[in-house]
Amino acid sequence: MFDDQDLGFFANFLGIFIFVLVMAYHFVMADVKYEGN
């Protein structure tokens, strides 16, 4: 299965991926809102 190192790497990667996804979503929504005005 997984050892502690693999689990830590996966958790770290998942956290970074979610953070980037939220930032990208925020920038896209902000751009759409500004273009609407």
UniProtKB/Swiss-Prot annotation:
Lumenal side: 1-8
InterPro entries reported in the protein's UniProt record: Oligosaccaryltransferase, OST4_plant, Ost4p_sf
Subcellular location: Endoplasmic reticulum membrane
UniProt keyword list: Endoplasmic reticulum, Membrane, Signal-anchor, Transmembrane, Transmembrane helix
One Gene Ontology cellular component annotation held by this UniProt entry: endoplasmic reticulum membrane
Lineage: Eukaryota, Viridiplantae, Streptophyta, Embryophyta, Tracheophyta
Reported function: Subunit of the oligosaccharyl transferase (OST) complex that catalyzes the initial transfer of a defined glycan (Glc(3)Man(9)GlcNAc(2) in eukaryotes) from the lipid carrier dolichol-pyrophosphate to an asparagine residue within an Asn-X-Ser/Thr consensus motif in nascent polypeptide chains, the first step in protein N-glycosylation. N-glycosylation occurs cotranslationally and the complex associates with the Sec61 complex at the channel-forming translocon complex that mediates protein translocation across the endoplasmic reticulum (ER). All subunits are required for a maximal enzyme activity.
Protein name: Dolichyl-diphosphooligosaccharide--protein glycosyltransferase subunit 4B
Organism of origin: Oryza sativa subsp. japonica
